[in-house]
Structure formats: structure tokens, C-alpha cells
Amino acid sequence: VTAPTSSCLLGDDLPVASLSESQALCFFNQEERDRALALGIFYLEIPESLDLEGARSFGQTLLDPASPYRKVPQYGDLEGFIALENNQQTKLALRRCHWDQHYPAEIVAFGRSLDAIGVAVMRDVLSHVGIPESCWGEASGGYSGGEGTAFLNFVHYDNSTGNEGLRPHTDYGFVTILDVTKPGLQV
């Protein structure tokens, strides 16, 4: 799922979805939904209630070496403030259970909004593939009901060195919501 910042970033022909007031994923028609799920990627219209600019601004504060958020401790290998020179990557990544402890209130609210979007996507996928609703909790590790694991990551990839950037990888979640602001995503 990605915000349609610019149609040239991922391709002009990706399906587009929006969220209904009841947090249901809506496509123009069933053919577009089928195509989105076959591709495994689609644009999502940014809900008006989502403060994307505030989140981007917060993400920029992580680039300041004096940012207090650079002192967030690591919880294992995947959480906390992490700066990886070999990947030209600076990030603050936290699971839902740590958001209130480390993120400012407006970023916690942003994370909860993204989490609701992720749940909507998960429910749509589970429904689309024919998994009975009574099995959704088990099939999604609880995520379809708002449980399970959710990360809110602020990641900056430094492109000032001219290096190719991040090595090939896969994300560790079932639903990844990206805010793509510059070309470079390879799917």
C-alpha cells in the first residue's frame, strides 16, 4: 500500500483504493481489487484525517544528531533507534506496545491511524482469498482484530553518497504501508 505522492514513482497503472468511513477498503470496481491483490501493491488515497506532513516532519527530526529520539533504546535487533552506515539508513522502529513510551502523542495517533489502515487491508485480503471470517484472527496472528504485531518505522535512506542504496530485502510484515517521496522503490 502506498500513498500516490507522484504517479511516476511506482508506475502510472497501479490500482487505487480509498477507505470508507467504516474503514473498509474500496476500489473503483471488483476488477481493480482483483488486480491489486494479484499485483500485491496498490495506491491508497491518503485519508484526510491522516497527518502525513506532521509525520514527515517528525521523521526529519531524526536526522539531527541532537534529536532526543536518537536515544530511544534498542529492543532486540529490529526496534529502537538504529543507524546503519552500510545501508545508508537511519531509522526509528517501534512495535505498537512501545509507541506511547517513546513517540509524541501526535505520532502515536498517526501510528494508530496507519494501524487501522493495515487492519482494513488485511481484512480485505483475507476476505478476497476466501478465508472464513471466523478464522481471520488465527490466519493473521490476531492482526485482523487489532492485535498481533504492528511496527511504526521512520526510515531515512541517505542518497547523498551516490551509492545504490539499500541491499535487496523483504519486509517482515504482511502489510507494508509506504510513503514514497522519491523514485527508487523496486518491487
Question: What are the functions of these language-model segments?
Answer:
Residues 1-187:
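Peripheral, non-catalytic segments flanking oxidoreductase cores
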